[in-house]
Swiss-Prot record:
InterPro entries: PPIase_dom_sf, PPIase_FKBP_dom, Trig_fac, Trigger_fac_C, Trigger_fac_C_sf, Trigger_fac_ribosome-bd_bac, Trigger_fac_ribosome-bd_sf, Trigger_fact/SurA_dom_sf. It holds the Pfam family FKBP_C. It catalyses: [protein]-peptidylproline (omega=180) = [protein]-peptidylproline (omega=0). Keywords: Cell cycle, Cell division, Chaperone, Cytoplasm, Isomerase, Rotamase. Involved in protein export. Acts as a chaperone by maintaining the newly synthesized protein in an open conformation. Functions as a peptidyl-prolyl cis-trans isomerase. This is Trigger factor. Consists of 3 domains; the N-terminus binds the ribosome, the middle domain has PPIase activity, while the C-terminus has intrinsic chaperone activity on its own. SUPFAM superfamilies: FKBP-like, Triger factor/SurA peptide-binding domain-like, Trigger factor ribosome-binding domain.
Length: 438
């Protein structure tokens, strides 16, 4: 087998492959063995007629289709491997020559990862981004901790806004019970807005053990068409009234909810955690700004199949999430009023940017000879094993060579990101002010 590659532009290639006649003959024989049973030749049982008689009766080309498929499947993957082309699409195949006793020649046109020259990627100037920790953020986290550790205490008084009440209720429309319109020991927070407008407000003032008939009107846009806009009566009994009691913010609280001895230590821990989150956000945004500047100085002709594959990835992720909530993709599209094409199109810009950035980082890694070391691979495998609650050796047993290569590629891309960040010129406001003439 011989082949030659012709590049077309920066992201396409045409491969011409010449396969020896013996290989095509092998394909013809396999096609004959597969299909002989479908041909009727007088004097022979199905599948027993010689190939030559079938070809004489039905034409020499009768076994060509499957023979061609066989040769393509046998040779194309080897050609791609030997050519070292980074193919990103299915091939468009054109048969140049085919026939018994002849070399089988075909052309395969494919999209490949684009070739491009890198713009300047060292010393890229960007503004420093910072997100200082606001005291309000710390207070918000503390309030969240208080809410998580609140106690609920029964009280013997009238219902007030904000109370948690336990009720029995039954709803009626035109004197008939509402289907699924009743419940026992139902917990409701007054003022939460979980019930029909007007329901919760009418419970205010009722005491524990009391019953009351509440009249409401279902909203016009209510989910059940049968009830939308209709008047309803609910018979309600208040069985328990509870109030939420938040713990005091003091040293005892800190000891109860954390490993710290004092409230100030707890606050410091929260502050550090928020700072780490804010610093990561700032760094991510600065890296994005660096990549954007490199991209502006770099011209890449991204093949459409690469973009479509990335869009497929995003859509499949949405479908998986919808399935988790018991919803089909078709129903979701109907609910948001979009076609499949419109929904996919909204991911195009994001997909293009993701591919562009990855291509740039791959190129930088290649130019700078950035590799994944054995130690880095082992560390990443340990992290993944911990994530999936597996022993490292068990995880290794499950991973294929392709999986390992994929993990290595991730390590290399992350190191390339670190490289451009460490080599960027990050200018703070103070530096800008100092450099400006008076």
């Amino acid at each position: 087998m011989e082949f030659k590659v012709e590049k077309k532009g920066t992201n396409k290639a045409v491969i011409e492959v010449e396969v020896e006649p013996e290989k095509f003959e092998e394909g013809l024989q396999k096609s004959y063995l597969k299909n002989a049973k479908y041909f009727k030749i007088p004097g022979f049982r199905p599948g027993k007629a010689p190939r030559s008689l079938i070809e004489r009766a039905y034409g020499e080309e009768v076994f060509y289709d499957d023979a061609i498929d066989y040769v393509l499947n046998e040779t194309y993957p080897k050609v791609i491997e030997e050519s070292k082309l980074e193919v990103v699409s299915r091939p468009e195949v054109d048969i140049v020559q085919v026939g018994k006793g002849k070399s089988f020649i075909y052309k395969a046109e494919v999209y490949i990862k684009p070739e491009f020259g890198l713009g300047e990627y060292k010393g890229v100037e960007i503004k420093k981004i910072e997100y200082p920790v606001a005291e309000e953020e710390v207070e918000h986290e503390l309030e969240h901790l208080r809410e998580e550790n609140a106690r609920f205490i029964s009280v013997d008084r009238e219902v007030q806004n904000g109370d948690i009440v336990t009720i029995d209720f039954e709803g009626f429309v035109d004197g008939e019970s509402i289907e699924n319109g009743s419940a026992q020991d139902y917990e409701l927070t007054i003022g939460s807005g979980r019930f029909i407008p007007g329901f919760e407000e009418q419970l205010i003032g009722i005491k524990k053990g009391e019953e009351k008939e509440i009249e409401v009107v279902f909203p016009e846009d209510y989910q059940s068409q049968e009830l939308a806009g209709k008047k309803a009566t609910f018979k309600v009994k208040v069985k328990e009234i509870k109030v939420k009691e938040l713990p005091e913010l003091d040293d005892e609280f800190a000891k109860d909810v954390s490993e710290y001895e004092t409230l100030e230590e707890l606050k410091a821990s929260i502050r550090n955690r928020i700072k780490e989150k804010n610093d990561k956000r700032a760094k991510d945004e600065m890296i994005d700004a660096i990549l954007e500047k490199i991209a502006q100085a770099t011209e890449i002709d991204i093949p459409e199949p690469m973009i479509e594959n990335q869009i497929n990835y995003y859509v499949e992720d949405v479908v998986r999430n919808l399935q988790y909530f018991g919803m089909t993709y078709e129903k979701y599209l109907e609910a948001i009023g979009k076609t499949d094409k419109e929904f996919r199109e909204q991911f195009r810009e994001r997909a293009t940017k993701a591919i562009r950035n990855n291509l740039i980082l791959e190129k930088i890694a290649k130019v700078e000879n950035i590799q994944a070391t054995d130690e880095e691979l082992e560390k990443e495998l340990e992290r993944l094993a911990k994530m999936y609650n597996l022993e490292v050796e068990k995880l290794k047993e499950r991973l294929s060579e392709d999986d390992i290569e994929y993990i290595k590629e991730g390590i290399i891309l992350n190191k390339a990101i670190d490289f451009i960040y460490e080599n960027a010129k990050i200018i703070s406001e103070e530096t800008q002010s100092e450099s400006q003439p008076e």
